């Protein structure tokens, strides 16, 4: 139960997120700040394989496949690089690859483009939508950026003052005009 009422269900059952992120086909999350989300002393291989090792779901080759799916060449010289030596865009892709190794049914992406330049943002949005189409997972894309939301989303919802409202396409112009998605 949620404060004020309501509940969260996943695949028809009460959601236990402590368990769901530890199993294949569960829920994975990509955070806004990949620098804080990834251990800077780990290598790329260690960071991407960590969720599988912690959950006991290790699969040979899963890290390499996930890295290639996000556009990172999984050669030995890249796999042995430390997280702190990567660019912001590379770190965000490693964070996404890390989530993909667990073959999520639901990927929660919390402001994944906020720390990227416009080109990096556009590339990441295209990549995420392509991954969603190819791998078949659902995605909850959390953002203040209406343009990004319009590019990647099949359905839009607005959370305002604790109320969740589904927007229909006719609402998008009004939302943009009202500035409801401005972070300021």
Q: Which positions does each model-derived feature cover?
A:
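Conserved ABC ATPase "signature" region
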Residues: 60-77
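Conserved ABC ATPase signature
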Residues: 82-86, 90
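Conserved beta-strand-loop-alpha-helix hinge in the C-terminal portion
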Residues: 159, 163-183
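Catalytic Walker B motif of ABC-type/P-loop ATPase nucleotide-binding domains
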Residues: 107-110
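ABC ATPase NBD coupling module
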Residues: 2-3, 13-28, 42, 54
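Conserved catalytic motifs of ABC-family nucleotide-binding domains
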Residues: 103
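Q-loop/switch helix immediately C-terminal to the Walker
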Residues: 33, 42-54
């Amino acid at each position: 139960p949620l404060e004020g009422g309501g509940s969260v269900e996943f695949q028809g059952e009460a959601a236990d997120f402590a368990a769901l992120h530890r199993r294949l086909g569960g829920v994975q999350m990509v955070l806004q700040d990949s620098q804080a989300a990834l251990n800077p002393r780990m290598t790329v291989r260690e960071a991407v394989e960590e969720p599988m090792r912690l959950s006991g779901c290790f699969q040979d080759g899963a890290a390499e496949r996930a890295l290639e799916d996000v556009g990172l060449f999984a050669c030995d010289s890249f796999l042995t690089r430390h997280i702190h030596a990567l660019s912001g865009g590379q770190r965000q892709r490693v964070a996404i690859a890390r989530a993909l190794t667990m073959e999520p049914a639901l990927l929660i992406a919390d402001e994944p483009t906020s720390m990227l330049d416009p080109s990096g943002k556009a590339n990441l949005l295209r990549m995420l939508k392509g991954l969603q189409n190819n791998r078949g997972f659902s995605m909850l894309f959390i953002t203040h950026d209406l343009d990004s939301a319009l590019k990647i989303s099949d359905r839009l919802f607005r959370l305002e003052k604790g109320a969740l409202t589904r927007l229909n396409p006719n609402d998008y112009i009004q939302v943009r005009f009202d500035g409801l998605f401005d972070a300021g």
